[in-house]
Amino acid sequence: MRILLIATNRHRRLMSRMNAQPVPIGLAYIAGHLDPDRHQLKILDLMFSEDYLADTEQAVKEFQPEMVGISLRNLDNSSYMDPQWALPITKEVIDKVRSVTKAPIVCGGPAFSLLPKECFNYLEPDMGVAGDGGETFAQLAECIESGETHRNLPGMVYRDNGAVAFNGLAYSNFARPPRLDELDMARYEQSGFGIGIVTKLDDNFSHSMDANSDGNSWRVLRPIEDVVAEIQEMKDRFDLRKIFFIDSGFNVPLPHAKALCQSIIESDLKIHWNSYLAPVPAACDEEVLGLMKQAGSGLVIMKGVAGHDLEQEALSTRMEPVQEVCQRCDEAGIHYVISQFFGEPGWNVLPRPVVV
């Protein structure tokens, strides 16, 4: 079966200031889960497109897909200076695809997974996959090809008697590497914070994480040897040396972080990497920060306090762990930024200014 995957993200700057053109790594993982002996695959990445609707129409007409996957990466561009909603572009792409083919359209991606029913209603694809969709999308392709039912698959979003049905989030173990050969990797190497590699993922990012928690609390905890092997493959195939570890909190669990850094150092990978850091003082000791620096850490992003955390404690109190971790990063020579949102659900008072 001919399958066309389209990455619709076109936002090129973070907060309207920093150059950030992320590789559609989720779509690449989807592609990696498809059986190349059974399916002919084409990836259309609209990030660098001069005319994204014309390119979409041309790709559909030339490839004649029998199934189309659409990736929605962001809900907006995360800018307070020039806020832009991301869904209209994806909606335009879906409408353009539908105007030239009757192939079923399946929508997914990080943003779609945040609000699957709402995004489904607005975008109007034929089906959706919410969550880590590698295995589900591959199974869905088999169902479409064979004519079998797909409604029992995890993560599926579909319309049932006029109402949107949702099977809950799908989960993946990311057992297969991403397929990157149809992406402009040389151009992405020069854009943003690095090429994404999944290390571990939690359902929530919170600085209440246990520094020494075991792998049972993570929905994805990839073996260190698999992560190192993927880095090596990135270097060998694409000469890439700038990596972004897709991780809910690189330093938690602390033993895992230290072991990964040590493996990177011993493998002599010589990479420059960025990631998220959990603002947990117990997971930011001198040893792990030193290992991170030696392993090539260039920048860490710390997520601040969620609105629901403020019901019983003052913001200044909740920010104390962030302040402490920032001080330790300064001492270790690790650059950092703090990501803190205000006015989200759970905020019922306007906090006083806090100096970090």
What are these regions, as identified by a protein language model?
Residues 1-232, 237-239:
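Acidic, low-complexity intrinsically disordered segments
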